[in-house]
Regions:
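Sec-dependent signal peptide recognition
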Residues: 2-11
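Hydrophobic h-region of N-terminal signal peptides that target proteins for export
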Residues: 11-19
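Extracellular/oxidizing-compartment recognition motifs
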Residues: 23-449, 474-475, 494-498, 528, ...
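Alpha-helical support elements that line or immediately flank enzyme active sites
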Residues: 157, 161, 333-351, 393, ...
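Active-site acid/base region of carbohydrate-active enzymes
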Residues: 166, 232, 246-253, 399-430, ...
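Non-catalytic C-terminal accessory modules of carbohydrate-active enzymes
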Residues: 229-232, 246, 250-276, 297-302, ...
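C-terminal capping/lid segments that line or modulate ligand- or cofactor-binding pockets
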Residues: 269-274, 450-451, 469, 513, ...
Length: 811
């Protein structure tokens, strides 16, 4: 009888299991972020992915917020990316939660997702309590600020920190977060960012101590005209929505032992001095009035440590000198213990990204450590370095516990590429590794060592590559806000954002304000940048119109003192033998960049149903295309006939249909005869070339150029020991740079054949391009719906796509 009951129970359980849906939702996000505590919107957007053990499509969803705030009810829709909240507007500081469930086409519902936290930040007319405070101004000193306070009860405790400069927060001696270099960047003369931390696990009933360590970072007189010679901070800690403590004159402060050694201008990022003997010597803080700077919520992920890199080699190179090789170039914080020192002993630490024989402090910086005689441990706190090699001077015993903490903005990744060609794999990995190192602090820099600026040209060059391999919509939203804040009253834009001082570039650099929002929309189905910054795009094009002569953009002036930009570049950092200074080439490149901006404005106006704008920009585009061809086409060549001069007109629709074959043939002929089959272009040309060869199916030509081992080329870099992409093809200046990362998307969209037909990859075409000699390829590309994987062996192609993505059948 017992055996019969057991068998019946098993049958019942199996039957129940068969009735359960075999799908679930995962990776829930609000505004593109995982459980954000302080968003800047009262009506956010929700996204989720679906895991299923068999093919399916979402037929309906249901979202609950609160759950008392909003219940969508069952909504018949397959939408699962950036689904808008439709309840009553949320309020400033409101903390709530949300969840979702879905139905498949057979009417079966998934389980509800786990509840996800959702918090609204300090928005609208709400303001943080308290005042900006600082301490120990001058000499680059970082400060430690503290306050004892008492709470009557514990609960949900949130700490809001708005710092001008970097900060770290400690409650009762414990660091409140594993984030580093907080907050993200902003245009600090216009906007600062508020970061919120959940400190519920650290607060206790009764007396507590809150400490804030702050370092000036970008907030300096020489960069953003700082009103105080040091970092400042305003902070507030709430328990269950009730303020418990905030920054004001009752706090005390002192020196935490760190000092900034640089002015944060080009070649001047220096490093940090740490005096391990320092005592805070507590004194009253300075209260500083800050006006005309908007404080808004940080809407991108923080920087976090992604990898701990340890040395591959270390040797003594002098009586008190030690050389360390970490094996690859990284953007990192150094951590080291230094034994055998006496109090007051000084150790200098030098860095190099290029050579074990050359340590230039103006390139990769340096640090200084002053020993206490015991517990001598150094770690970067408010600065970082680009390095492969480290040289210690003043240390007689070998350094111990050496680690490099490679960090970046904590976005989601998951891309991979492999093929039958190890050299091609090496190029892909070089580019991917470089981009990850350069995407930190809520923007992407040219190089983190020499200039550390968010150049628009470098951004345009790498945007499609980075957005192909990572979930960086929040990062681009933060970066684009800095561009909008940098715009001048006449509509002019600088070449970098944030914009602490003048920097070189040209119209292609400024067009980031147009190109980046369109790419964010196509790659993530996120309309926020497009909608938020559309007025800035139009204002910039009005500025451009002022310097249009006979239908063509011409040289614009260097703005008056203080200048916020210089130069009027076409292409940049092209190899030797390519004249990027040719005036006709410069005008052609800049007018093609303008045509590309008009193309994207037409598309964005379509999406936003702005019919008059769409018609206006379409007319401007067609007129400009005609003028470019009439002006720059001569006997089969455009302008100087360089690769970028030939390809950019092809990309933006300038070349008449009847001339395309002739122009392409001439391009290839000149590549062989003038450039020996090599890439022969620079920062602007690489992404332009990549996008054109992908669209045109020119995989054999591209593959042939990438396979060249001599100068210039990626294999030339690798053959000469590169572990990051160089700033110049010949290796000058930075060895970890954003100039030439524009080829990254080609591995996925051409060789993998993954082409987005609808925003966010909701509908795709999968048609791998097959260059001769490449036997097989396997790629995985992350999308807002989940990963797409494509495998090609010979002519045979297989793929898997996530739920929510449909594949267009090939003809």
């Amino acid at each position: 009888m017992n055996k019969l009951c057991q068998r019946l129970a098993i049958v019942v359980l199996l039957a129940l299991a068969a009735c359960q849906p075999s799908f679930e939702v995962y990776d829930l996000r609000c505004e593109g972020l995982v459980e954000p505590l302080g968003i800047d919107s009262t009506q956010p957007h929700f996204s989720w992915k679906i895991a299923s053990d068999k093919p399916m499509q979402q037929a309906a969803y249901e979202i609950e917020v609160g759950p008392e705030l909003w219940k969508s009810g069952k909504v018949d829709s397959d939408r699962q990316v950036m689904v808008p909240y439709a309840g009553q507007p949320l309020m400033s500081r409101q903390q709530t939660r949300w969840r979702v469930r879905i139905w498949n086409g057979e009417g079966k519902a998934s389980a509800w997702s786990p509840w996800q936290r959702l918090g609204v930040g300090i928005i609208g007319d709400d303001r943080l309590k308290g005042e900006y405070i600082g301490a120990v101004p001058g000499e680059g000193r970082a400060s430690l600020l503290r306050k004892d306070f008492e709470v009557k009860k514990t609960g949900t405790a949130l700490l809001y920190v708005n710092s001008l400069g970097y900060h770290e927060a400690y409650l009762n001696g414990e660091k409140v977060s594993d984030a580093v270099l907080q907050p993200a960047v902003s245009q600090l003369d216009k906007r600062s960012l508020i970061v919120v931390y959940d400190v519920s696990h650290l607060i206790r009933k009764g007396f507590n101590e809150l400490c804030l360590a702050i370092g000036s970072g970008w907030y300096k007189k020489a960069t953003f005209d700082a009103v105080y010679d040091g970092a400042l901070v305003k902070a507030e800690l709430d328990v269950d929505g009730e303020p418990q403590v905030w920054t004001d004159a009752s706090w005390e402060g002192g020196w935490n032992g760190y000092s900034d050694l640089g002015d944060w201008r080009p070649h001047g990022f220096g490093g940090e001095l740490l005096d391990n003997r320092a005592d805070p010597d507590w004194a009253p803080v300075d209260v500083v009035k800050i006006e005309d700077i908007t404080a808004s919520m940080q809407m991108c992920e923080p920087c976090r440590i992604q990898e701990i890199v340890t040395p591959v080699f270390m040797e003594r190179v002098g009586e008190d000198q030690w050389l360390v090789d970490f094996g690859k170039v990284v953007n990192a914080l150094l951590d080291v213990e230094m034994p055998g020192l006496q109090a007051g002993d000084q150790v200098k630490i030098f860095y190099s990204d290029a050579s074990a024989d050359s340590f230039d402090p103006e390139i990769c910086g340096y640090d200084v450590f002053i020993a206490a005689g015991e517990g001598d441990h150094f770690q970067n706190c408010f600065n970082h370095h680009i390095f492969r090699y480290v040289l210690f001077e003043g240390l007689k015993q070998a350094p111990e516990e050496l680690q490099a903490y490679r960090m970046r903005t904590d976005f989601a990744t998951g891309a991979s590429f492999s093929s039958s060609d190890p050299e091609l794999n090496a190029i892909h990995d070089l580019v991917l590794r470089t981009m990850e190192n350069l995407a930190f602090d809520g923007y992407m820099v040219d190089c983190a060592s020499i200039e550390r600026l968010g150049y628009g040209g470098d951004g345009n060059a790498s945007a499609q590559s980075l957005q192909t391999v990572a979930g960086v919509s929040p990062l681009f939203l933060n970066w684009l806000q800095a561009w909008a804040d940098s715009q001048k009253e006449d509509g002019g834009l600088p070449h970098t954002a944030p914009n602490p001082y003048k920097a070189g570039g040209g119209p292609y650099w400024c067009s980031f304000i147009v190109q980046a929002p369109w790419r964010v929309y196509m790659n993530y189905a996120d309309t926020r940048p497009m909608e938020r910054f559309y007025p800035n795009m139009k204002h910039w094009l009005d500025y451009v119109d002022a310097y249009t002569v006979d239908g063509l953009l011409k040289q614009w002036p260097t703005p008056p003192t203080p200048p916020y930009r210089w130069w009027y570049l076409g292409d940049w950092a092209a190899p030797e033998g390519v004249n990027v200074q040719d005036p006709e080439s410069i005008d052609l490149v800049n007018n093609c960049a303008l045509a590309q901006s008009y193309e994207e404005l037409v598309r964005m106006a379509q999406v936003m149903n702005l019919e008059a704008d769409e018609a206006d920009y379409r007319q401007r585009l067609e007129a400009l295309r005609k003028r470019i061809h009439e002006t720059f086409y001569h006997d089969g060549l455009y302008a100087s006939g360089s690769q970028v001069d030939m390809i950019y007109p092809l990309l933006v629709g300038v070349v008449p249909d009847g001339l395309k074959e002739q122009v392409v043939a001439k391009l290839k002929e000149r590549t062989e005869t003038l450039y020996n089959g090599h890439l022969a272009t620079g920062l602007v040309g690489i992404p332009v070339l990549t996008e054109w060869v992908t669209r045109a199916g020119e995989c054999d030509w591209m593959y042939g150029m990438l396979k060249q081992h001599g100068y210039p080329g990626y294999l030339h870099m690798i053959d000469n020991g590169a572990t990051g992409v160089w700033e110049h093809w010949d290796g000058r200046r930075s060895r970890l740079h954003n100039c030439f990362n524009g080829i990254g998307s080609w591995f996925y969209q051409a060789l993998g054949g993954i082409v987005a037909l609808e925003p966010g990859y909701r509908k795709v075409k999968i048609a791998p391009q097959i260059p001769a000699g490449l036997e097989w390829v396997e790629v995985t590309q992350p999308t807002p719906y989940g990963p797409i994987t494509v495998k090609r062996q010979g002519q045979e192609v297989s793929y898997t796509v996530p739920v929510g993505v449909t594949v267009e059948e090939n003809d």
